C-alpha cells in the first residue's frame, strides 16, 4: 500500500475514535464510529487474499448492524428526552438496545462469533489494531452511559463472555484465535465491573491493551502464527520465546504477574458490593483461560511437537530492534507490586 494512502487511512481511524471519545452529541458519536469503520476496512485487507476479504466483509457487516442498532437507540432516546446529549439515557428500551449495539461492536457474548473469524483471517499487525485500538471507542461510550445501563443484561453478557473466552480457546492451535478468545474473556471482565466502578474498567482496559500489544509485537518479531511455529522459535530465539510464554501467563492472570492485578481488584470490588456468587463464578471460569495458557506454555517449553526440524541453535546475525518492546514486556509482567498505589480508585 502507498505510504501516503496508509497514513491518511490511519489518521482517519485515529480521528474517528477521537471524535467518539471527545463528543457529547449522539450524532457526532455515530459519525465517529462510521469514519472509523470505513477507514479500518482497507487496513484489514492490506494483504489482499480471499481470507482477508472474507474477514473484512464479516467485520463490516457486524459493525454496520451494530451502528444501525445504535442509531435506532439514539432516535428512541431523542423521542423520549428531546435532547442529543450523552449525559443520560432516559428510556430503558433505548438503554438496552444501546448496550446490545456496543456489545456487538466490542465482541461480547452472544455477539462474539465474528471476533475469532475476523482475527484469524487478517495479518498480525491488523489483528493488533483490531483487538486493541478498536475497543477504545465502544468502551468509552459504555463508560459514559454506565449509570443508565441495565445491570442484569450487562452482567449476563459479561459472565457468558468469560465462559466463552475460556472455552473457545481450549481447542485452538492458531495463536491469533487464542488472542481473539482471550480478548472476549477480558471484555467480559471489564463489562462485569463497569456499573460498579467504571474507573476500574478503564484500568483493566489499559493493562489489557499493554499485554495484547506486547503479545502481538512478540509474535510479529518471531513470525509465529501457530503453536507449532512457536515451538520452533526455541531454536531461533529462546529469549523471545520465554518472554512470549511469560506474557501469555500474565494474560491468563497468574498471581505474580501484571494480569492478576485487574482480576484481583474486580473480584474485590464485586465482593464489596455484596456480590458473592458472581465473582466466584468469574474466578472459576478464569481457570479455563489460565488452563489453555499453561497448556500452551507446557507444550512449547517442555515438549516438542512431532516435526522434522533437526537444525541446531541458530545464531542471530540480524536482530530486529524494537525500542518499545522492553518497557512493554516489563509493564506486562511486573506491575503487580504497584497495586497499593491504586487505592485512589476507591
Curated annotation (Swiss-Prot):
Subcellular location(s) per record: Mitochondrion inner membrane
One GO CC annotation: mitochondrial inner membrane
Matching InterPro entries: Complex_I_Subunit_2, NADH_DH_su2_C, NADH_UbQ_OxRdtase_chain2, ND/Mrp_TM
Cystine crosslinks: none
Gene Ontology BP annotations: mitochondrial electron transport, NADH to ubiquinone; mitochondrial respiratory chain complex I assembly
Domain of life according to the entry: Eukaryota
Bilayer-crossing regions: 3-23, 25-45, 59-79, 96-116, 122-142, 149-169, 178-198, 200-220, 237-257, 274-294, 322-342
The EC number(s) this enzyme carries: 7.1.1.2
Membrane topology, from the record: Multi-pass membrane protein
Alphabetized UniProt keyword annotations: Electron transport, Membrane, Mitochondrion, Mitochondrion inner membrane, NAD, Respiratory chain, Translocase, Transmembrane, Transmembrane helix, Transport, Ubiquinone
GO function term, MF aspect, one: NADH dehydrogenase (ubiquinone) activity
Catalytic reactions of this protein: a ubiquinone + NADH + 5 H(+)(in) = a ubiquinol + NAD(+) + 4 H(+)(out)
Record-linked Pfam families: NADH_dehy_S2_C, Proton_antipo_M
PANTHER family: NADH-UBIQUINONE OXIDOREDUCTASE CHAIN 2
Assembly and interaction partners: Core subunit of respiratory chain NADH dehydrogenase (Complex I) which is composed of 45 different subunits. Interacts with TMEM242.
Family listed: Belongs to the complex I subunit 2 family.
Its job: Core subunit of the mitochondrial membrane respiratory chain NADH dehydrogenase (Complex I) which catalyzes electron transfer from NADH through the respiratory chain, using ubiquinone as an electron acceptor. Essential for the catalytic activity and assembly of complex I.
This protein's name: NADH-ubiquinone oxidoreductase chain 2
Name of the gene: MT-ND2
Amino acid at each position: 500500500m502507498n505510504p501516503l494512502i496508509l497514513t491518511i487511512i490511519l489518521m482517519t481511524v485515529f480521528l474517528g475514535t477521537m471524535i467518539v471519545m471527545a463528543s457529547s452529541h449522539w450524532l457526532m458519536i455515530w459519525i465517529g464510529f462510521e469514519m472509523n469503520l470505513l477507514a479500518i476496512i482497507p487496513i484489514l485487507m492490506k494483504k489482499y487474499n480471499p481470507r482477508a476479504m472474507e474477514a473484512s466483509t464479516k467485520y463490516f457487516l457486524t459493525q454496520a448492524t451494530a451502528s444501525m442498532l445504535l442509531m435506532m437507540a439514539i432516535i428512541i432516546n431523542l423521542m423520549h428526552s428531546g435532547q442529543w446529549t450523552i449525559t443520560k439515557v432516559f428510556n430503558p428500551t433505548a438503554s438496552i438496545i444501546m448496550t446490545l449495539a456496543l456489545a456487538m461492536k466490542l465482541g461480547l457474548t452472544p455477539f462474539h462469533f465474528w471476533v475469532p473469524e475476523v482475527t484469524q483471517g487478517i495479518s498480525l499487525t491488523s489483528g493488533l489494531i483490531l483487538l486493541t485500538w478498536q475497543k477504545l471507542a465502544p468502551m468509552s461510550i459504555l463508560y459514559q452511559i454506565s449509570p443508565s445501563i441495565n445491570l442484569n443484561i450487562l452482567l449476563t453478557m459479561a459472565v457468558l463472555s468469560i465462559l466463552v473466552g475460556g472455552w473457545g480457546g481450549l481447542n485452538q492451535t492458531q495463536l491469533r484465535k487464542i488472542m481473539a478468545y482471550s480478548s472476549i474473556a477480558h471484555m467480559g471482565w471489564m463489562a462485569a465491573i463497569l456499573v460498579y466502578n467504571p474507573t476500574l474498567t478503564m484500568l483493566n482496559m489499559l493493562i489489557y491493551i499493554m499485554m495484547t500489544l506486547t503479545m502481538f509485537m512478540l509474535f510479529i518479531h518471531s513470525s509465529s502464527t501457530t503453536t507449532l511455529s512457536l515451538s520452533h522459535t526455541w531454536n531461533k530465539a529462546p529469549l523471545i520465546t520465554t518472554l512470549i510464554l511469560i506474557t501469555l501467563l500474565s494474560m491468563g492472570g497468574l498471581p505474580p504477574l501484571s494480569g492478576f492485578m485487574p482480576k484481583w481488584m474486580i473480584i474485590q470490588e464485586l465482593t464489596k458490593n455484596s456480590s458473592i456468587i458472581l465473582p466466584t463464578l468469574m474466578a472459576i471460569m478464569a481457570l479455563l483461560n489460565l488452563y489453555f495458557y499453561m497448556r500452551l506454555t507446557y507444550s512449547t517449553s517442555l515438549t516438542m511437537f512431532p516435526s522434522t526440524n533437526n537444525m541446531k541453535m541458530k545464531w542471530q546475525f540480524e536482530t530486529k530492534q524494537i525500542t518499545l518492546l522492553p518497557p512493554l514486556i516489563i509493564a506486562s509482567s511486573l506491575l503487580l507490586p504497584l497495586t497499593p498505589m491504586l487505592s485512589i480508585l476507591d
